[in-house]
Amino acid sequence: MKMIKNEIENKILNVRRRPANMRKILKVGKPLSATYSHSAHTLSILAAEDDNKGWLLNCFVQLFGDRCDFLDYQDFGFMECPIIDTQHIGIDMVDIGWKSRIDFIKMAIINDYYVYAELNTSKIKAYGQSVVFAHDALIYGFDEENKQFLIADFFQHKKYGNTWIEEDELKN
């Protein structure tokens, strides 16, 4: 337990020692398939590394047949991917452990963690919606000078892509 605490403290110190107006973007690539957010996000992370291509082509199968009439389209995501290490951190823990959710997201990205989070699409212009709706997005970059975050999801025209959003949009 003490080792974990020291590791977390070291990561927090690294965030505090970082340069002002930092910009960091984690690598993503074009996903092999972009049908649902959870699989598109996972596949875009995996597509960033050429070494993953063999695994994807040999092990990722989205189409399958079964005698069951029920079709389950939720068969793949980051939690099921054996070559991605995931951690589930509840928003209550984020609120307890960090000054703000924005600071948590920045710290995660600085330490090379992608952030998968449900966002209120009515607060983010790129979605082009006014109705309150939660949708899972991938946050993988930030720019402190412009106060923006880089996210990937299915935006206004329902095509998977990425865009920079204002920090205030993410706060809401």
Map each language-model feature to its residues:
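Conserved active-site-adjacent core of cysteine acyl-enzyme catalytic domains
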Residues: 4-172
